[in-house]
Amino acid sequence: EMCIRDRLTGAGMSAESGISTFRDAGGLWDRYPVEQVATPEGYQRDPALVINFYNERRKQLLDVTPNRGHELLAELEKNFRVTVVTQNIDNLHERAGSSHIIHLHGELTKVCSSRDPYNPHYIKELKPEEYEVKLGDKAGDGTQLRPFIVWFGEAGPEIETAIQYVEKADIFVIIGT
């Protein structure tokens, strides 16, 4: 029995749903220098800018829906064991119905401790009414909540898990990256 095990999805997967990409012309990096909003140093220099940047990205999720590509991947789970390995930080795979997802770059709908970002005790899933994180909002360890995003210069906590799945995959498909 063949097992379609893994799919790697990137920005192109969610662009069709209306999610802004980072690298395309007119993308997020044209409007926000990467070193300001996607590095630990940028966060240390101006946490308010970084928090607001990701608040705006979260709000964008309220206006978009999964596209047919997300839905088709979710439908594959009816007949195959599927793991979606995604570089996307949105929640469109979950909303489409995929149940086994590895987020390489973090998850926009979660926040974590500024001191210990990948400690599972301090990671919190936000409800849509909580998407507006403010300076002063604290994690369980008393530090400022920060986006649960793997920034440039940080090691992603899910990379080893993803490698294990990819190595065991009968088929590996790359979509939108």
Question: What is each of the regions a protein language model found here?
Answer:
Residues 1, 5-177:
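Conserved catalytic core of sirtuin-type NAD+-dependent deacylases
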